[in-house]
């Protein structure tokens, strides 16, 4: 039965497992599409326009924002990043789900956008701050200064947990993955996401009349 797609927002402090859960979710269901962001930064070696990012000039990006063509946007280290609305709207209409791996500010903008009714938002918490610190250090890719900055930012990010529809405490990655799948499966079955249900039920009622 046909259904309308949904916008799945996944947010967490750095190190809580958001990116790993996102990858596992799309491996479980390849039909889920990652939102491709637009950016004004220069392409890195191997990056392809339209696949990794939509690369835009600063003027093009600002014009898109002013025209209401971005679901959310922010400036990070002198470069603009944002989520173009048109590809997401097309995916929704075709019944495809779009996954946003974004922070609470981006999630807030999308929830307040014209597509807010299609949003399912999930916040991922660490089991403890000590474990969060351990996970960041286990990556062995950040300096002490970067880790300290990420930990300081985490306190602010965690303070927004109550703005989300669902909250997962990632004590065990496999369990958190299963919980994430259950949330998505249930949300896909919501009555308002199944536009063909009315006709289906009419058909059932018609069968009563022909018995």
Swiss-Prot record:
Q: What is its main location?
A: cytoplasm
A GO MF annotation of the entry reads: ATP binding
Which enzyme class?
Answer: transferase
The residues that hold ATP are 12-19
Q: What CDD domains does its record include?
A: GMPK (cd00071)
**SMART domains (UniProt xref):** GuKc (SM00072)
EC numbers listed for it are 2.7.4.8
Output the Gene Ontology cellular-component terms: cytosol
Q: Which reaction does it catalyse?
A: GMP + ATP = GDP + ADP
Q: Which residues belong to any copy of the Guanylate kinase-like domain?
A: 5-185
Tell whether Hydrolase is among the UniProt keywords: no
- Keywords carried by this UniProt record: ATP-binding, Cytoplasm, Kinase, Nucleotide-binding, Transferase
List where in the cell it is found.
Answer: Cytoplasm
Source organism, top-level taxon:
Bacteria
Instruction: Give the family, as the similarity comment puts it.
Output: Belongs to the guanylate kinase family.
In UniProt terms, what function does this protein have?
Essential for recycling GMP and indirectly, cGMP.
Task: Name the PANTHER family on file.
Answer: GUANYLATE KINASE (PTHR23117:SF13), GUANYLATE KINASE-RELATED (PTHR23117)
The name under which this protein is listed is Guanylate kinase
Species of provenance: Cereibacter sphaeroides (strain ATCC 17023 / DSM 158 / JCM 6121 / CCUG 31486 / LMG 2827 / NBRC 12203 / NCIMB 8253 / ATH 2.4.1.) (Rhodobacter sphaeroides)
The opening ranks of the lineage are: Bacteria, Pseudomonadati, Pseudomonadota, Alphaproteobacteria, Rhodobacterales
Query: Encoded by which gene?
Result: gmk
